[in-house]
Amino acid sequence: MLLYIVIIVACIISKLVPNEYWAIHLFFIIMIFMVYMYKKLDIHQKYQFWNYTMSGLSGHNVQVTCKCY
């Protein structure tokens, strides 16, 4: 459901916003979607999410240790 809302909002913004600012708005839409998905995860999945994200961004194997009590 949220994905459809994000797509609809992206289409509306693409029609209203000048072309040179489209990348900035797309970045914020993606960030909002990532935060929403992150909040749905439990504590162990959150650490795995950041391990995968940081590994993808840096190109190196990154391990965030989970101190879950």
From Swiss-Prot:
One term under GO cellular component: host cell membrane
Cytoplasmic side: 1-15
Subcellular location: Host membrane
Keywords: Glycoprotein, Host membrane, Membrane, Transmembrane, Transmembrane helix
Glycosylation-annotated residues: N51
Bilayer-spanning residue ranges: 16-36
Extracellular side: 37-69
UniProt membrane topology term: Single-pass membrane protein
Similarity-based family: Belongs to the asfivirus X69R family.
Protein name per UniProt: Uncharacterized membrane protein X69R
